[in-house]
Structure formats: structure tokens, C-alpha cells
């Protein structure tokens, strides 16, 4: 399990995370939302062991995180982070070499590396551009390479920071499909994003953060339907939730479901 217990973190004398109790093992996809400065990025860095809390703990497998070199190496093979800017974690001009970088550092046999790289590229739908130089790839393609680089570790938890930022509508749809495929393999995904519609559609549970504290937690439909909490957090409701709360239309999880239900209603009225 990956969780936090009374997690506090300060930058100098300024508390950024204030007593957070979170459990990411309960849901396949957990969304983290909040206004800028609420602590999402700092939380991600604590979960990955890049930062160490001054009080409380990050819990891995039910125990406080081991911050020794060996302990952090073990954690990062099971908890992988993909940053908002893929340039931060791409080091080679050759895609296969970049994705295989961490495995070669771990001494994984070449035959196993080849198999894992091939599987990761297939999962992120990158086989058709795997032989292109990385500098020639689009922003969205680089994001997929970065995700593939995390997937080859066979991590059980994947932390995605703004996975749809900078993507066009087609790229956003493709990213959602990739996340669903990752989850279908039995993995957990934690998404930090300002894309409220994404979080609503794909998450099974949502934490709303405000000034380093949990303002609300629960199922996406319940959380985002709470207008008062959304306003207090400085957030807007997903458009599907707005249609429900402001117009009384059925609460749907996806755009496809919404239009299907509207078509059924229109057909009934016409007949």
C-alpha cells in the first residue's frame, strides 16, 4: 500500500502539507485537485521520496518509508513518477535507449529489457514512432515516451503530474486510453491535474486539497457536486457535473454516456 499518516512538510518556516492522511491503495485511479499552491507537487515529491516530511510519514507496504539509498531504490521500482514536462526525464535521443536506461542501471538482462521496452511502447501506442529521434517528437509523443520509461520498471503505482497538459483533444483522448490500459493491468494511478473534467471522468476517488489540507475526499460525483467545497477550493465543477447541479440533468460520468442518455430521452419524447 501507498499512504500517508499525519504528513507535515515545511519549506523553511512555512507549512505546505498539514497533517495529511491519504490512502492510495483503495482505488485504482485517485485524483488530486486544488488551486495552485495547495501542495499537490510537494505531496508528489514526498510520495516518491524526493522530499522527507518533518513530521508524520509516507507509508509503503504499511511501514514508514525507508530513506536509505537501498530503501529509496526499492521504492522507486514500485512507485514511479512522470513529470508534467517530459523533457525533465528524457536523457537520450534514441527512444529505446531512453526507455531502457533505468533497467540497464539495475543490471536487468538485455533479453528482459528488450521484452519490457517493447511491451511499454505497445501500451502507450508508440510503436509507430519508436525509431524517430526524440527531438523530432511532439510534446504528446514525448509524454508517452516518459510514461513508457516508468512502465518498464513494472511499478505498482504511477504518479502522473498534469498528464493532459499541452495536449490537443486527440492527444487527451489517447492519454485517457493509456491510463485505462495501465489500470487494466492491475496498477494504481495517482493523477495531479488542473484538468477537472479529466479527473472527474477517469478517477475512482478524489482528494481536494486547500492550503495543504484535505478539504474533501470521496467519489468524484459526490465531491464535484458539492458546489460550496468547489468554490472554497478555488475550483470549477466539471461540465457534466454543472449540467446536473444547475440544470437538473442526469449525472453522467463521460461525455459518451451523457449524449447516449440524451438521445434516448429525445427518442422517447418523439415516440
From Swiss-Prot:
GO terms for molecular function: ATP binding; ATP hydrolysis activity; ATPase-coupled transmembrane transporter activity. Belongs to the ABC transporter superfamily. Cobalt importer (TC 3.A.1.18.1) family. Its EC number is 7.-.-.-. Forms an energy-coupling factor (ECF) transporter complex composed of an ATP-binding protein (A component, CbiO), a transmembrane protein (T component, CbiQ) and 2 possible substrate-capture proteins (S components, CbiM and CbiN) of unknown stoichimetry. InterPro entries: AAA+_ATPase, ABC_transporter-like_ATP-bd, ABC_transporter-like_CS, ABC_transpr_CbiO/EcfA_su, Co_trans_ATP-bd, ECF_ABC_transporter_ATP-bd, P-loop_NTPase. Residues 2-236 form the ABC transporter domain. The keyword ATP-binding applies. Its main location: membrane. It is a peripheral membrane protein. Gene3D superfamilies: P-loop containing nucleotide triphosphate hydrolases (3.40.50.300). It comes from the Bacteria. It comes from Salmonella paratyphi A (strain ATCC 9150 / SARB42). Pathway: Cofactor biosynthesis; adenosylcobalamin biosynthesis. This is Cobalt import ATP-binding protein CbiO. It holds the Pfam family ABC_tran. Keywords: ATP-binding, Cell inner membrane, Cell membrane, Cobalamin biosynthesis, Cobalt, Cobalt transport, Ion transport, Membrane, Nucleotide-binding, Translocase, Transport. GO terms for cellular component: ATP-binding cassette (ABC) transporter complex. NCBIfam families: cbiO (TIGR01166), PRK13638.1 (NF010159).
Amino acid at each position: 500500500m501507498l499512504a500517508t499518516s499525519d504528513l507535515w512538510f515545511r519549506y523553511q518556516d512555512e507549512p505546505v502539507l498539514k497533517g495529511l492522511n491519504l490512502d492510495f491503495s483503495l482505488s485504482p485511479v485517485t485524483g488530486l485537485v486544488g488551486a495552485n499552491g495547495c501542495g499537490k507537487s510537494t505531496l508528489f515529491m514526498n510520495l516518491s521520496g524526493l522530499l522527507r516530511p518533518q513530521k508524520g510519514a509516507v507509508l509503503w507496504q504499511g511501514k514508514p518509508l525507508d530513506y536509505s539509498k537501498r530503501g529509496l531504490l526499492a521504492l522507486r521500482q514500485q512507485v514511479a513518477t512522470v513529470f508534467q514536462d517530459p523533457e525533465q526525464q528524457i536523457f537520450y535521443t534514441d527512444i529505446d535507449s531512453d526507455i531502457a536506461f533505468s533497467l540497464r542501471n539495475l543490471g536487468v538482462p538485455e533479453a528482459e529489457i528488450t521484452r519490457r521496452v517493447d511491451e511499454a511502447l505497445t501500451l502507450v501506442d508508440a510503436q509507430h514512432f519508436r525509431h524517430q529521434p526524440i527531438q523530432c517528437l511532439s510534446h504528446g509523443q514525448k509524454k508517452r515516451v516518459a510514461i513508457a520509461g516508468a512502465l518498464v520498471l513494472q511499478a505498482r503505482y504511477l504518479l502522473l503530474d498534469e498528464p493532459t497538459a499541452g495536449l490537443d483533444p486527440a492527444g487527451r483522448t489517447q492519454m485517457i486510453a493509456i491510463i485505462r490500459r495501465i489500470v487494466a493491468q492491475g496498477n494504481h494511478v495517482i493523477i495531479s491535474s488542473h484538468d477537472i473534467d479529466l479527473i472527474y471522468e477517469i478517477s475512482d476517488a478524489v482528494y481536494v486539497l486547500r492550503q495543504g489540507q484535505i478539504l474533501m475526499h470521496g467519489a468524484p460525483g459526490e465531491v464535484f457536486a458539492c458546489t460550496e467545497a468547489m468554490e472554497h477550493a478555488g475550483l470549477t465543477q466539471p461540465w457534466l457535473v454543472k449540467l446536473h447541479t444547475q440544470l437538473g440533468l442526469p449525472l453522467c460520468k463521460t461525455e459518451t454516456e451523457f449524449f447516449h442518455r440524451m438521445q434516448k430521452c429525445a427518442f422517447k419524447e418523439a415516440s
